[in-house]
């Protein structure tokens, strides 16, 4: 039995002069294998679409491009592959011209949409990595959907030459009724042009984009490692009051938030914490919170900005308290009843660009005088400016934190994109290389090799849904839940 050539993206029966024969018993094992590939392709892509629909964690903008790719792959598996197998079995086309045109249209449109879906997915990852915060404003489901519709619209443009080539070119091509092929199958210039637009140009651009993505992610990871090596995380910061008596409970073990929340106690042991509207009546001897090194000071701007004024209930109490104040460019923390000698301070000029510091002074007595109250009010006003400054710093570092989280997600997404692109190029490039050869040399064609390159391109639609759970934990968990697979 004569082995027919199959129609595929940019290919229509160009190997007529090199036909080979194959007996029907020899053909059946191949048909079984190809049919299995077809069923697996349909099943896996349906699983991807159902997973995205049923799992809220997968309702992301990035996964809209995955859905577009899965729809294209589903069309390849549900329409293009089965009709190719049928054509292979029949050895000739006997289903009529309308069904032939439908098959050719689905083949061209789905294959092109699959390529364009990978392309716009690559662009999305590129912009997310290169401009993470700026692109977040524009990375909406509406814009992503519009981009996807644009890609599918361009793919459907294939219908125009498939259905109306003779009408637009005002020519009549000789067509064999037992073959399913386009009217432009022997027009070399058109096929070369469409090959460049459909494959070679998008592939080169994707490789360039991915090189930029890889470089940006690598630089970001190195930058984060450098920061993490020089600046501790918020949970690692320790503010420790100097305690010459060596109390059993070391304040240095407390987190910054716990230190700020520590309440003063009255003579009877009761805690007193007054609202910010109340002015402290007394300021006992101030004490510094010592740091291991200067680099930790910069993290103090991450304090929650619930600044409170605290006051001792009874004069002469030996209980300690903390008050946040700023005077003459210094941030002081005060503790009552602690006598220290010798002043020391930690500068953070290099970290914050000003002269804020933690200081310890040698005073163990404080009298409630009018001048003292005036200084407190002045310090309170100055502290207000510090709060504004701190809030700006907090917002700046919050943006950096959000950017860091976003980059971590994009690093995983870049890994997924890398696998998708590798599968795409490995599956399609043999066919397009072979296509360019036979476009200029119609006799340089081996039918078996040609069929192999065609189906290798189709198999890309089978591999794509296997890549998603491999590189995405949410996909993996959702697949296991749907298939009732225990971890």
Swiss-Prot record:
This is Histamine H1 receptor. One of its GO terms (molecular function) is histamine receptor activity. Residues 353-370 have a biased composition (Polar residues). Histamine activates the receptor by forming hydrogen bonds with transmembrane domains 3 and 6, squashing the ligand-binding pocket on the extracellular side and opening the cavity for G-protein engagement on the intracellular side. The keyword Cell membrane applies. One of its GO terms (biological process) is G protein-coupled receptor signaling pathway. Residues 238-261 have a biased composition (Basic and acidic residues).
């Amino acid at each position: 039995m004569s082995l027919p050539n199959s129609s595929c993206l940019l290919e229509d029966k160009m190997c007529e002069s090199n036909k080979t024969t194959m007996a029907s018993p020899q053909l059946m094992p191949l048909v079984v294998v190809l049919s299995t590939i077809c069923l697996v392709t349909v099943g896996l892509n349906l699983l991807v679409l159902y997973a995205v629909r049923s799992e809220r964690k997968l309702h992301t903008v990035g996964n809209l491009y995955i859905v577009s790719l899965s729809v294209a792959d589903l069309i390849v598996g549900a329409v293009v592959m089965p009709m190719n197998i049928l054509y292979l079995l029949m050895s000739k086309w006997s289903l009529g011209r309308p069904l032939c045109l439908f098959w050719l249209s689905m083949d061209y449109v789905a294959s092109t949409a699959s390529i364009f879906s990978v392309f716009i997915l690559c662009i999305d990852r590129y912009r997310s990595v290169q401009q993470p915060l700026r692109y977040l404003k524009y990375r909406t489901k509406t814009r992503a959907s519009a981009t996807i519709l644009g890609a599918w619209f361009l793919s459907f443009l294939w219908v125009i030459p498939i259905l109306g080539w003779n009408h637009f070119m005002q020519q009549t091509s000789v067509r064999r009724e037992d073959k399913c092929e386009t009217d432009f199958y022997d027009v070399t210039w058109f096929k070369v042009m469409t090959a460049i637009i459909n494959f070679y140009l998008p592939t080169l651009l994707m490789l360039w984009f991915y090189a930029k993505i890889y470089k940006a992610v690598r630089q970001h990871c190195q930058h984060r490692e450098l920061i993490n090596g020089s600046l501790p995380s918020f949970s690692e910061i320790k503010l420790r009051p100097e305690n010459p008596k060596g109390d059993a409970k070391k304040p240095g073990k407390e987190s910054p938030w716990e230190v700020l929340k520590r309440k003063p106690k009255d003579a009877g042991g009761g805690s007193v914490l007054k609202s910010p509207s109340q002015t402290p009546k007394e300021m006992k001897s101030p004490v510094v919170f010592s740091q291991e090194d200067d680099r930790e000071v910069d993290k103090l701007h991450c304090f929650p900005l619930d600044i409170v004024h605290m006051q001792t209930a009874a004069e002469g109490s030996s209980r300690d308290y903390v008050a946040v104040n700023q005077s003459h460019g210094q941030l002081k923390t005060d503790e009552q009843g602690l006598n220290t000698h010798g002043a020391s301070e930690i500068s953070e000029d290099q970290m914050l660009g000003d002269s804020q510091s933690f200081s310890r002074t040698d005073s163990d007595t404080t009298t409630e005088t009018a001048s003292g109250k005036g200084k407190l009010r002045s310090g309170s006003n100055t502290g207000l400016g510090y709060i504004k400054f701190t809030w700006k710093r907090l917002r700046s570092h919050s943006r950096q934190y959000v950017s860091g989280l976003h980059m971590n997600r994009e690093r995983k997404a870049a890994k997924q994109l890398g696998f998708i692109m590798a599968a795409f190029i490995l599956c399609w490039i043999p066919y397009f290389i072979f296509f360019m050869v036979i476009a200029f040399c119609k006799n340089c064609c081996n039918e078996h090799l040609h069929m192999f390159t065609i189906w290798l391109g189709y198999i890309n639609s089978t591999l794509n849904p296997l890549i998603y759970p491999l590189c995405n934990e949410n996909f993996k968990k959702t697949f296991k839940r749907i298939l009732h697979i225990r971890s």
